Amino acid sequence: MAKAVKKEIAKSEEVVSIKAPRKEPGKKIPVVSIVGRQNVGKSTLFNSLLKKKLAITEDYPGVTRDVLSARIYQEEKDLDFYLCDTPGLDIENPDSLSQTILETAYGQLRESDVIVFLLDKNLITTADHGLLNYLRREDKVANKPIIYCVNKADKELDEFDLEEFYRMGLSEVLPISAIGRKNLGLLLEKIQFFLKDKPGKVWIEKISASKKKEAQPLPLAEEDYEFRLAIVGKPNSGKSSLLNAICGYERAVVSDVAGTTRDSIDTLLEFGDRRLLLTDTAGIRKQSKTAEALEFYSYQRTIKAIESSDLVIHLLDAKKGFGDFDKKITSLLQEKGKPFLLAVNKWDSIEDKTDKTFKEYKEKLYSRFPLLNEVPIITISATERLRVQKLMDLSFDLASRSHRKVSTSELNKNLKNWMGLAGRSFSAHQPPKMLYCTQVSTSPFHLILFVNHVEYFKSNLVSFLKKKLTETYDLQGIPIRLEFRSDRK
């Protein structure tokens, strides 16, 4: 038996690939959801099937708070479906947060084509029985194919080991080991069997830009979007509420508890004839806290979301102001060279506002972080959907401006003129001179300048040149990098 198990593990290693082609127009890709109580290994199974660490896996209940999805595709095995990891459905005394999570997960089950019900070999609880009863009785779920998997079966199980599962009324169970990758190939074969000739369902929705915001089918796997937009900010700044306000429906779990969204969620949106991929990231916490196991992977994915994005909305809390940690986020965005804009959320909660309130807020903001003076800023209320459409208009505008290319001759002419205007006012030495410059990238707006002496170009002169570039080429919100090189022939 040991050899057979070893062979099965080897087989499972080559079953899964997530490199999928674009979905054919009109073709629907089915959805498979992993369900179970907390801490039975759902996220570990999700990651093992994907062969990458996408969901958070940690031996602590309640880690996956939102529905994660990824496409599994392998042409030679005729495998093509969306795999979804749902939160644990066993919260006995649901508070406002867990109730919202439960509703999100139950909604996901109703949209699934096949359900993988995961159980723990070592422990059957009342939560398992309760979830099983729900799957059997819920009208929109009861007729769906369900694969019952017994996880943590690292050794072969005999009939005695499975007796308790049979007493639950499960006529067929599949022993697996998510960590050891045992029998994952068989699991995929069962999924393939149930999905054969099924029309499938669409996992993501197309969001109309109209006020009605009616949902229509749209494939998640298509990547013909204009740009990738990430929403970042400290915990409880309203990121998920903003995502829901933009989408017009509750795609992410929303709660007033900081850190509710621990997993990045991608949503493909269409506004008129323009598309974008919207990412709601986990709240960035201070480095000392993200070192903890529970938040580590979420923090890393947030950084990756910023790195992989084309444009970023940095969300601020109007009542909390611009704190030291917001400065760290802004510095990170500057460091990564990402175009971004500031959205001051919860503006409706500010009392006794006047015509000068916003101006005073900006002045205070710029005094704490002068670089923000050239960044677009807008006040919004995600919960009230105040100026959310204007925020999206600004995002599309910023995306368009982030590809600004300037001819080398024009750059050289303007920069030399500006430096002539500056004269010696920015240097105690002889006037700094630029011999030649060229643009090497658009986002960030990166210039290489060959100069007489690099040390002559002090920070005040560099700031002056960046300001002139911003004003001349409409680069508000787009980081500018000036790289100076000495040219001493």
Curated annotation (Swiss-Prot):
GTP 2 binds at residues 233-240, 280-284, 345-348. GTP 1 binds at residues 36-43, 85-89, 151-154. The keyword Nucleotidyltransferase does not apply. Keywords: GTP-binding, Nucleotide-binding, Repeat, Ribosome biogenesis. GO terms for molecular function: GTP binding; ribosome binding. Residues 30-199, 227-403 form the EngA-type G domain. Residues 404-488 form the KH-like domain. SUPFAM superfamilies: P-loop containing nucleoside triphosphate hydrolases. InterPro entries: G_ENGA (IPR031166), GTP-bd (IPR006073), GTPase_Der (IPR016484), KH_dom-like (IPR032859), KH_dom-like_a/b (IPR015946), P-loop_NTPase (IPR027417), Small_GTP-bd (IPR005225). GO terms for biological process: ribosome biogenesis. Belongs to the TRAFAC class TrmE-Era-EngA-EngB-Septin-like GTPase superfamily. EngA (Der) GTPase family. GTPase that plays an essential role in the late steps of ribosome biogenesis. Associates with the 50S ribosomal subunit. This is GTPase Der. It comes from Leptospira interrogans serogroup Icterohaemorrhagiae serovar copenhageni (strain Fiocruz L1-130). The lineage of its organism: Bacteria, Pseudomonadati, Spirochaetota, Spirochaetia, Leptospirales.
